[in-house]
Curated annotation (Swiss-Prot):
Lineage: Eukaryota, Fungi, Dikarya, Ascomycota, Pezizomycotina
Residue span of region Disordered: 1-216, 322-356
Bias kind Low complexity: ranges: 202-216
The protein's name in its UniProt record: rRNA biogenesis protein RRP36
Family classification: Belongs to the RRP36 family.
Composition bias, Basic residues: 154-164
Subcellular location: Nucleus, Nucleolus
Length: 356
């Protein structure tokens, strides 16, 4: 309820009493005294009502922002008969307005309750303020709001796979490639030798793992002559490489053929070394199992000890070194030394890589 309406009510009440006193001059003195007492009672009631209204205004002032702006417009609506209002009512009204207009240092003119409520507009400056207009806060753009929202979110870390056989973990925000396969060519048929196929071996042994391993061992023994064929093929390829290297006038075809032969020799030799390493590990494992059985039969051990994969590899390397000749050992040690030195050089800082 605006203050101007309250002032109008009080003015009307006092005017009615004054007019009544002026026109009732012929009445008795007792009636005049009673009228004066009634006027004083009405003034006290009006002051009490003004106090109640001022307290209500203090409570409602924190929720209504438009009351402060209406104070300036109320001055033009007040009648010129404000001189009849009592000074006590004016002082109380001024005190209530002073409490509502007093700015705070933390909120800059906004009440503490109003400062806590988000989305509220700052109150309009009143007539009792210093006259300085508060500058409106600049509105953030949508892009800035988006950046602020993303900045508050903690970065999500992808958990690592439990093992190398687990599926790859990838974020759902990963961009999909724009390349699409329209026509998929038919798969190229691969040659499969049933003698060494694990599917055929497991099917022939009715899924028994031990029997399948024995079948693979027997197949390896039965076709051991293929190793000699591979060695002969590698020797023939090396002869072709030597003839091409000694050729004086080399064409582009000769250069390409020489590079192809070198790649083929490297691939076949690596495959041959892999076969030999696996055969060595298998022999180490067979010998260990044989020793464990003998110890259990003699009663020296109650349970066998099963070698781990790393232990099998270490024993296979030691056995291979014992079977090597002097020159082969030196070559193997030199290759090992160069390999370790290369790893250390990669881990070394750039400033220390230069040899003084």
């Amino acid at each position: 309820m605006p203050i101007s309406s309250k002032f109008n009510q009080r003015v009307r009440a006092r005017l009615e009493e004054d007019e009544f006193e002026q026109f009732s001059g012929e009445s008795t003195s007792d009636e005049g005294l009673e009228g004066g007492e009634s006027v004083e009672d009405e003034e006290e009631q009006e002051e009490n009502s003004a106090e109640d209204h001022s307290e209500e205004d203090d409570d409602e002032g924190e929720e209504d922002d438009d009351d402060d702006g209406d104070v300036e417009d109320s001055s033009s609506d007040i009648n010129p008969s404000l001189n009849a209002i009592s000074f006590g009512a004016l002082a109380k009204a001024q005190a209530s307005l002073g409490k509502r207009k007093r700015p705070t240092a933390s909120t800059g003119g906004i009440s503490p309750k109003r400062a806590k409520v988000p989305g509220r507009h700052s109150p309009t400056p009143s007539a009792s303020s210093s006259g300085e207009k508060q500058e409106p806060e600049p509105e953030l753009s949508e892009y800035q709001k988006h950046l602020a929202a993303n900045a508050k979110k903690p970065p999500q870390k992808l958990t690592h796979r439990t093992s190398k056989h687990a599926p790859t973990i990838q974020s759902s925000r990963h961009a999909v490639s724009r390349k699409r396969t329209i026509l998929e060519p038919p798969p190229v048929p691969k040659a499969r030798d049933p003698r060494f196929d694990s599917v055929v071996l497991s099917h022939s042994t009715n899924g028994n793992s031990s029997t399948a391993s024995n079948a693979a061992i027997h197949a390896r023994k039965n076709y051991a002559f293929l190793d000699s064929y591979r060695k002969d093929e590698i020797a023939q390829l090396r002869k072709q490489v030597s003839t091409l290297q000694t050729k004086k006038h080399k064409t582009n075809y000769d250069e390409r053929e020489l590079a192809r032969l070198k790649r083929q020799i490297t691939s076949m030799s690596d495959r041959q070394r892999t076969f030999e390493r696996k055969e060595m590990e298998r022999e180490v494992l067979v010998q260990h199992r044989r020793k464990e059985r003998e110890l259990i039969r003699e009663g020296k051990k109650s349970q066998p000890y099963f070698l781990k994969r790393g232990e099998v590899k270490k024993e296979a390397v030691a056995k291979r070194f014992t079977e090597m000749s002097g020159k082969e050992k030196q070559r193997a040690l030199e290759r090992r030394r160069k390999k370790v030195a290369g790893k250390e050089r990669k881990e070394m800082p750039w400033g220390r890589r230069v040899v003084e």
